[in-house]
A protein has these predicted regions:
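N-terminal periplasmic "start-of-domain" segments of outer-membrane beta-barrel proteins
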Residues: 1-8
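Flexible, glycine-rich terminal cap/loop adjacent to redox cofactors
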Residues: 8-19, 24-122
Length: 122
């Protein structure tokens, strides 16, 4: 079961599912979509608050497109992680999260941008 956790720091760090390191240690093939918060154009709130440090990272099964884990170190991470956890439990794919229509402007729009980029190499 995908149970989210959050460390309430500034900015918050939230996580759900397996980490990239855990998946690779088990020999699981994983596509990693990650982007520094400062480079996410679709996410204005961190810039407005002056908290642009951090990272949003998704581990995706390249065969099924299911999210295997996510780590969010950003403004509103404690809220965004709940959406990601629900998506994981419901079998929503990374592509469906990427193509979602979210409130504008909101931190949720980061999903469109982070998941749209090509996965990085191991």
């Amino acid at each position: 079961m995908a149970v989210p956790t959050t460390t309430f720091a500034t900015p918050p760090f939230a996580r759900v599912g397996a980490s990239e390191e855990e998946l690779r240690a088990k020999g699981v093939d994983v596509a990693v979509h990650a982007k520094p918060v400062a480079k996410i154009a679709a996410m204005p709130r961190p810039k407005v608050l002056g908290e642009t440090h951090g990272l949003i990272k998704f581990c995706v099964d390249p065969e099924t497109d299911l999210v295997l884990g996510a780590a969010l170190h950003t403004v509103d991470a404690q809220e965004l992680i709940n959406l990601v956890a629900l998506a994981m439990r419901a079998g929503v794919t990374a592509s469906e999260l990427r193509d979602g229509i979210w409130t504008h402007p909101s931190s949720t729009e980061a999903l469109n941008e982070v998941l749209a980029g090509p996965p990085r190499d191991a």
